[in-house]
């Protein structure tokens, strides 16, 4: 925490639920790290924070989606990181499955061993390589495309990045604010913090998982971290 410019505690009160960790965050704050707490209530850790963002219960995922949309709107997304270190360039067929080389008529020639000790074929994921203007296995791509996909050998595809953009489109600042109770200005500030204000360390707590949409909320927050 002490090496980050900002530390976000999202969905919990570390001072109560993880007392053994709380002092690290407070020591980092004393050393100059901004402490941000996103939680449903103003509790102990929030009282020690530089910025407290109160959010309606079970709407953490919505807040993350709204911040992602604002990042896209401003062109702040970490394009190189998304291209090189995430699944953003992978191609998805209309049936929701990844496009693989076997879909293009290239049968697997290698095998690997799965967790059950069985030999299974290696059928590589496909991306569109902008450098060669061709569909290639992910490992062979120089510059995988993140969008603008035409059908490949008659197969309609989209990148994961395009699907993320589509998923966050409804989450305008106003709609996100209405759902979460977080002000438009705070949503904008959160998006700016994650992308324009230096290193951010996020400590996502178990509070998000206390609702039946907890898994999806966690995935939305993780997506915010990847996009930024």
Predicted segments with their positions:
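The substrate-binding groove and active-site-proximal loops of carbohydrate-active enzymes
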Residues: 7-15, 112, 173
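Long, well-ordered, tryptophan-enriched scaffold segments
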Residues: 46-47, 51-197
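A glycine-rich, hydrophobic/aromatic-adjacent loop/helix-cap motif
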Residues: 185, 194-228
């Amino acid at each position: 925490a002490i090496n980050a410019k900002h530390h976000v505690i999202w969905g919990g009160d570390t001072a109560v639920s993880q007392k053994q960790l709380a002092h690290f965050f407070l020591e980092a704050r004393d050393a100059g790290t901004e402490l941000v707490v996103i939680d449903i209530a103003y509790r102990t850790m929030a009282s020690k924070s530089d910025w407290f963002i109160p959010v309606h219960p079970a709407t953490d995922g919505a807040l993350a989606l709204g911040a992602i949309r604002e990042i896209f709107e401003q062109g702040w997304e970490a394009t190189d990181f998304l291209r090189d270190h995430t699944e953003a360039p992978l191609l998805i067929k209309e049936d929701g499955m990844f496009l693989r080389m076997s879909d293009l008529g290239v049968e697997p020639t290698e095998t690997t061993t799965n967790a059950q000790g069985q030999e299974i074929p290696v059928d590589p994921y496909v991306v569109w390589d902008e450098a060669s203007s061709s569909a290639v296995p992910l490992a062979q791509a120089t510059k995988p495309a993140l969008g603008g996909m035409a059908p490949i050998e008659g197969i309609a595809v989209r990148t994961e990045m395009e699907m993320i953009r589509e998923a966050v489109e409804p989450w305008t600042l106003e709609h996100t604010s209405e759902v979460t109770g977080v002000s438009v200005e705070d949503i904008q500030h959160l998006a700016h913090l994650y992308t324009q204000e230096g290193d951010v360390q996020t400590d996502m707590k178990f509070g998000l998982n206390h609702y039946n949409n907890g898994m999806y909320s966690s995935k939305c927050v993780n997506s915010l971290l990847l996009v930024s």
